[in-house]
UniProtKB/Swiss-Prot annotation:
Residues 1-24 form the signal peptide. Residues 692-714 form a propeptide. GO terms for biological process: ganglioside catabolic process; oligosaccharide catabolic process. Implicated in attachment and penetration of host cells, possibly via a neuraminidase activity. BNR repeats lie at residues 258-268, 302-313. Keywords: Cell membrane, Glycoprotein, GPI-anchor, Lipoprotein, Membrane, Repeat, Signal. The gene is GP85. This is 85 kDa surface antigen. It holds the Pfam family TS_C. One of its GO terms (cellular component) is intracellular membrane-bounded organelle.
Amino acid sequence: MSRRVFTSAALHLLVVMWMCCGPCEAAAASTGENSVNARQPQRFDLFVPQKTVLLPRGGGNSEKKWDSFASPSLVSAGGVIAAFAEGHLSSKNKDNKSTEPSSDAVAWYIDSAWEWSTLVGEVNKSTWQAHTVLGKVDGKERFDVVLRPTTTTKDNKVFLLAGSSVASNVNGSWSHGGLKLKLVVGDVRKPTDSEQSGRINWGEVQSPLNENSGAVQERKLTAFVASGGAGVLMEDGTIVFSLMARNEEEDVYSMIIYSKDDGSTWALSNSVSSAKCVNPRITEWEGSLLMIVDCEDEQKVYVSRDMGTTWTEAVGKLLGVWVNSGSGASQDSSLHVDALITATIEGRRVMLYTQRGNSLGENANPLYLWVTDNNRSFHVGPVGMDNAEKEELESALLYSDGKLHLLQRRVSGEGSVISLSRLTEELKEIESVLSTWAQKDIFFSSLSIPTAGLVAVLSDAAGDGRWNDEYLCLNATVKNAVKVKDGFQLTESNSRVLWSVNTRDNNLRHVFLSHDFTVVATVIIQNVPSGKTSLLTATLANTESNYTMGLSYTADNKWETIFKGDKKPTTESRPWEPKKEYQVALMLQGKKASVYIDGRSLGEGEALLTDEKSLEFVHFCFGACVQESSPTAAQKTKVTVTNVFLYNRPLNSTEMRAIKDRIPIPKRGPGSQVEGGTERRHIPRIEGVRANAPVGSGLLPLLLLLGLWVFAAL
């Protein structure tokens, strides 16, 4: 069965004049090369071409050694970890004549209680064998082709959905039937005395899709294949799989199929993605389904609150997604996100995802692990490597029984291999970071500082030319500045603090803000400059436009605002005093840009940005942020900058005042509510400012996937 690769264009990055800040990590910022050479997890090859022995479905002695493996999927149920892959047999027979390749869903069953050394020892035993799940040989002229096993669990049951096609030899010519969906449900049972681990007893293969349903007939859908990766078990017990469907016009759509009765009946979603959007990945977040798809020249994110009856394109919501570049660059060389799961760790609901990036100067594709609570994200580090320059790096994540596993397809000298890793040290780091997030939220809440939408804080932590984020995620770089309590003093004409928030840095993708944010800082101007001097500047850019907003101060003791896009700058003035403490803030709400001094608006401007595109670059800079020839270039003066707070939403004046005043809250009684370490409190409403954003609003970094086009030319 022929397969063609779907490649979407990578986003062309706007080049800016500044160096980027260090990546979101607690340790010192490192180069891309050093990041790649960092610790590697425990790893063991599960599926190896021509080595792994697989038993046929139903048992028997017809053992086979398969030729390649792809599309990993990983689940845990009833004390058994089940690792799945798409296995392929050779396309040549014993006479070296070409035949139609066949494939199947294959699986390892592993005891979830095993220590890593035990697991490796058991799998290495000659008696240890993997299993086939779906496909079978029916005579010499008929083979089942199984594609993209996709799995999820409920209680002790494992649900596996895959695409399937039947190939037949008619007069010496191979032909295919249409791609159909197959579902099989397995019950996990405990091992017998003669077995190394528990196993899964699979039921009969089903066809879950009613092809006479309105959703199929109205769209004239003719072929279906599962997405691969993981399905979702919703909080209400609904089982959901993502899939792709092709219509009579050869257009491909992404959609879902779901069951509300434990798999007895299945329904296809009424709504679909845009045409030619493939490789859906889904997860549940705060009661909604998120679906991320690869389209022709961009990534799209959809949100549904009604099981796919309607899908709303969420522009700028899942901010890790690459969007239309207009560059024509191959996605093979771009960053993208692959595996995605939702888990509860340290009492906090988070998403874990893997992101691929290219190592500088090498044909290697490190796989990075991230954790996000949709408010902030932490870069854990590289967890895998693929030495094939243009190969798809597929992966699956599983968090279960207090352990984190990665199932990864990689290319080695033995071919396409599926490896299992236990991310023990990575999980410890994630737990430590999430604990820090909770502690910081509680601390700032105790000072009446709002934590809803709080992304990062720069205060007293610093070192090696960096101003470190209290939440360990978003460090700033410092040049020619002196450390003071809770911040830095800028003492030279070229002194600056640069905080790169949305950027590509060290082959990693950092996206923290959409078209809504507030940055708040405390400043003291020690002496009067000889000319107009830049204090705080924000540079914003997407693929089609860029914009600068900022605040400067003059020799005649006036504040001046700067709002510059395609129009001429506009300014408004207000006096300032030397050695006096001020709270300064920049705010973006949609296209409305604002500057505040001590909670009072100093001026507003229209940000000439494209709403349909996310902000690919957001840079904040204190001090020497502009070219020296600029009329607002920094003069030699001393400015102290302390306690910088960054929010992914607008703040109102009451909240800004709370940040400045920091009034301790009396200890709460037993009835107080701090959930998951995150403050749940009413945010005062000010007209024109959406200040009642819930915790976790502003969905954050998720996914970019390589598109593997699985629909054959039938």
